From Swiss-Prot:
Source taxon at top rank: Bacteria
Protein name per the record: ATP phosphoribosyltransferase
Catalytic activity reported: 1-(5-phospho-beta-D-ribosyl)-ATP + diphosphate = 5-phospho-alpha-D-ribose 1-diphosphate + ATP
Alphabetically ordered keywords of this record: Amino-acid biosynthesis, ATP-binding, Cytoplasm, Glycosyltransferase, Histidine biosynthesis, Nucleotide-binding, Transferase
Localisation: Cytoplasm
EC number, as in UniProt: 2.4.2.17
Organism in which the protein naturally occurs: Hydrogenobaculum sp. (strain Y04AAS1)
One Gene Ontology term, aspect cellular component: cytoplasm
Purpose: Catalyzes the condensation of ATP and 5-phosphoribose 1-diphosphate to form N'-(5'-phosphoribosyl)-ATP (PR-ATP). Has a crucial role in the pathway because the rate of histidine biosynthesis seems to be controlled primarily by regulation of HisG enzymatic activity.
Transmembrane segments: none
SUBUNIT field: Heteromultimer composed of HisG and HisZ subunits.
Pfam families for the chain: HisG
Major place of residence: cytoplasm
Keyword Methyltransferase (UniProt): no
Length: 204
């Protein structure tokens, strides 16, 4: 049995539809309170997006589907074996209130709210800008509105949530998409089974 870690939420739906469309599974993976789902030869572990790579690195899962944003924030000792460029598409951006756009172009020091601490620090260090990072685990759009931060670093898919909260994109950091990652030991001992999946998904 091949153990596959997949994230809860939006990516679960996309991955389920992808596997179904490629005849890898006979029915969709339904999101429910059940966190381990066995379908044919696969055991799906439904976990938090930020935990997928940990499950794979530690060998609890053989392979996993994870966003590039997660891998950049917290690199792991795993193999990245396939890009799913049309799955989990989003962008990592710096966003803030429109009136801050002029200030953004002449930054020397700023407060940034984000859950992507390492990405934010690396990005602004590359610009030689000193920042005070305020780590938040959700609803980061609130931070600039109430004056907790000057800007946020977060992922956006359509920009709708930013717009609804009166924020605009100041700068794109990178585009993100899903990747299939693999445990290093599993890659050796389950190589045949893993490559059967890759063959079916390689045109994505």
């Amino acid at each position: 049995m091949l153990k596959i870690a997949i994230p809860k939420g939006r990516l679960l739906e996309e991955v389920s539809e992808l596997f179904l469309s490629k005849s890898l599974i006979p029915s969709k993976i339904e999101e429910s309170r059940k966190l381990i789902v066995d379908i044919d030869y696969f055991r799906f572990l439904i976990v938090k997006p930020s935990d997928v790579a940990t499950y794979v690195e530690q060998g609890a899962a053989d392979i996993g589907v994870v966003g590039l944003d997660v891998l950049k924030e917290e690199p792991k000792e795993i193999y990245e074996i396939l890009d799913l460029k049309n799955i989990g598409k989003c962008s990592m951006v710096v966003a803030g209130k429109p009136e801050k756009l002029g200030d953004y172009k002449i930054l020397h020091f700023t407060k940034v709210a984000t859950k992507y601490v390492n990405i934010a620090r690396s990005f602004f260090e590359g610009k030689d800008v000193s920042i005070n990072i305020i780590k938040l685990n959700g609803s980061v759009e609130i931070a600039p509105i109430i004056g907790l931060s000057d800007y946020i670093v977060d992922i956006t898919q359509t920009g709708k949530t930013l717009k609804e909260n009166g924020l605009i994109v100041m700068e794109k950091i990178f585009d993100s998409h899903a990747k299939i990652i693999c445990n290093k030991v599993a890659f050796r001992i389950k190589k045949y089974d893993i490559f059967k999946i890759l063959d079916k998904l390689s045109d994505i």
